[in-house]
Amino acid sequence: MKKVELQAHRGVESEYPQNTMVSFRAAAEQGYERIELDPRVTKDGQFVVLHDRKINSTARNPDGSPIGKELLISDLTYAEALEYDFGIWFSPEFRGEKLPLFRDVLTLAAEKGVSLKIDNKLFEMKPEERYAFYGLVRATGADVVISCVTEAHADEVNALLPEAEVSFDGLCDNEMLKRLNAVFGRDRLTVWVPIERRMAEWAPTDWFASPEKAAAILPFAKLGIWAIGSVDSFHEACRLYHPDAAETSGNIKPSDAMES
């Protein structure tokens, strides 16, 4: 079977606090080829990595206690965000972990030779913020993949980051596949489908993988799979769908992909 590229979702989030430098560093050191992360922007225009709009789910006061009020990252300067701890919620051993700057993750990725998948939360930013984000990526020459859920998003990426790959995470029929392929070719386009319903209960039924769906995608794009509960499920999905890439929270290791 072909080798499947593994990407670490928010770093190795099953073993480390998600979207932190320690989690990203672990992903690189464990041999994942790509790291998925969530971009946000602070009140003073600093690009940071955080899944939610609010910091409360993964941030704590320095003593480990919950933050008393809900705080939007867009209402905080980066200096204000640094007052909170982003590791202790996961385990006391990660006390002191801070909210990472995106530019520091770019530096780490360059040092470790891994690429970055930028989640489609990028498109929740204002246009001028996105353009500044693209400028930062261009200035560093980083190897990035941008996650898109609409053709308009994909067109924007192609115009402003013409070397970047696109990860299409939305529903995609054959006509859209053909249009995307005409712009990006197969090498710059990956279409993602979930595997297990229990891990993506919110997803539309017709989004899930099937041999027929995989066969329709693969002539036009690389195939990515996600929502994979176990190594056995991963190997079965590889047998059925012949994916090019898979996303994991850390339960599937690079050595498992080598065996697929």
Name each model feature, range by range:
Residues 1-260:
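Phosphate-group recognition and catalysis centered on beta-loop-alpha active-site segments
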